[in-house]
């Protein structure tokens, strides 16, 4: 296996089609693009009450669990996704939704706050995520978020929609001629994605996903690189991992860490910090033979209790496999099943974008790559589950399927999450 890149790339792409008619700044080293942008400046100090912040966090966790369960039913192996990335892209779309389309989206995405306060909460989260930790080398820790919207050339956009995007997401709209030249437009958008991911994801939109009916494309990219605060020794030996499909031998890291270790009924967990203490990886390992049941039984309350249980436990020993894999999935059916089918049909109402009901969602595409090694990552329980510290000796052996969460510590936001059922894949 080639040297791990220590990175995570999360990309969400959303395309909208028109029902008739033809109706961040330009990336470097590419031809300049025409950008439509509000005269409004980004709100750099959004006002979000503590109550709204708590509601926003709970809502996000609820959607992340819904998404996890939906992907679990359709993905047989390892998978990775980012609720933060998916929600941000769809929140930009939600800003233009109206009537029952908006109601369905709010229900499916767990957007319970009023629209103005919701967008302010997304803005506050984005600003918090992209604030670099003090006195930390960028080579050791980077977390970057980028949003872009691409619209049919000559397509009218309401000023209020542009204002919302500018003030809360720092985004404008790039013009492309999808109607006449869909392939060059697709190349331009894929080029933007490649720039944001340092060319690790060169083709977000494969041929055919953008065509002459496309009128609007939303893209959200998250780049994460984090060295472990305490790195594992190099040259990890092979060890057995009890995968769902049978035992495999995989490179397995052994290291002493000041990781938090804690446990509950049927599971053990660890939290490994990244340099700068801005983010941590939380690993949750269900008891042997209980992984499927643990996944199925997860609730917002039980998952909240698990994630809140991390506390310093002194020197600890963590034994875990190296792993790397990619996820590439269309979310159309998933989002429809979660309760927003109207957005994908001719009856969709995105009149908040252009003042007319002639847009619907064509595709929502999510791509992710993760690599975890000795250096770092560049990328069950009923309600009221009991949580307690693991007694000494403090050792967690991750030799069976597990869940992982990469959490932004200051906000508690889950940046990335997924499962590893076979690290050899």
Where are these regions (language model features)?
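Extended hydrophobic
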Residues: 218, 268-284, 392-425
């Amino acid at each position: 296996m080639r040297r791990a890149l220590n990175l995570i790339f999360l990309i969400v792409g959303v395309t909208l089609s028109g029902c008739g008619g033809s109706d961040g700044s330009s990336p470097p080293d590419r031809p300049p693009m025409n950008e439509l942008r509000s005269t409004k400046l980004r709100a750099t100090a959004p006002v979000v009450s503590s109550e709204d912040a708590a509601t926003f966090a709970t809502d996000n966790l609820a959607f992340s669990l819904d998404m996890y369960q939906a992907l679990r039913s359709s993905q047989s192996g390892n998978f990775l996704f980012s609720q933060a990335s998916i929600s941000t892209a769809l929140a930009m779309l939600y800003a233009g939704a109206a009537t029952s389309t908006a109601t369905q989206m709010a229900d499916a995405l767990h957007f319970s706050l009023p629209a103005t306060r919701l967008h302010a909460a997304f803005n506050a989260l984005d600003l918090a995520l992209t604030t670099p930790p003090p006195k930390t080398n960028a080579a050791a820790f980077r977390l970057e978020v980028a949003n872009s919207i691409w619209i049919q050339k000559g397509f009218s956009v309401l000023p209020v929609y542009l204002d919302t995007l500018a003030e809360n997401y720092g985004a404008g709209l790039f013009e492309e001629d999808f109607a006449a030249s869909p392939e060059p437009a697709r190349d331009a958008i894929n080029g933007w994605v490649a720039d944001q991911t340092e060319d690790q994801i060169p083709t977000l939109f494969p041929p055919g996903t953008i065509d002459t009916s496309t009128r609007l494309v939303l893209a959200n990219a998250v780049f994460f690189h984090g060295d472990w605060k305490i790195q594992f020794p190099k040259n990890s030996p092979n060890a057995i991992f009890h995968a769902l499909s049978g035992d495999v031998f995989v490179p397995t890291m052994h290291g002493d860490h000041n990781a938090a270790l804690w446990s509950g009924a049927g599971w053990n967990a660890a939290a490994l910090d990244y340099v700068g203490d801005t983010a941590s990886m939380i690993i949750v390992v269900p008891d042997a033979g209980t992984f499927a049941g643990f996944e199925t039984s997860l609730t917002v309350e039980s998952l909240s209790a698990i994630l809140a249980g991390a506390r310093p436990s002194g020197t600890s020993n963590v034994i875990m496999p190296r792993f790397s894999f990619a996820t590439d999935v269309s979310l159309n059916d998933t989002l429809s099943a979660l309760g927003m089918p109207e957005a994908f049909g001719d009856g969709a109402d995105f009149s908040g974008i252009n003042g007319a009901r002639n847009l619907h969602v064509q595709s929502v595409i999510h791509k992710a790559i993760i690599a975890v090694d000795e250096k770092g990552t560049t990328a069950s329980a009923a309600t009221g589950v009991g949580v307690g510290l693991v007694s000494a000796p403090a050792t967690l052996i991750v030799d069976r399927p597990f869940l992982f969460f990469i959490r932004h510590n200051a906000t508690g936001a889950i940046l990335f999450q997924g499962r590893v059922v076979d690290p050899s894949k």
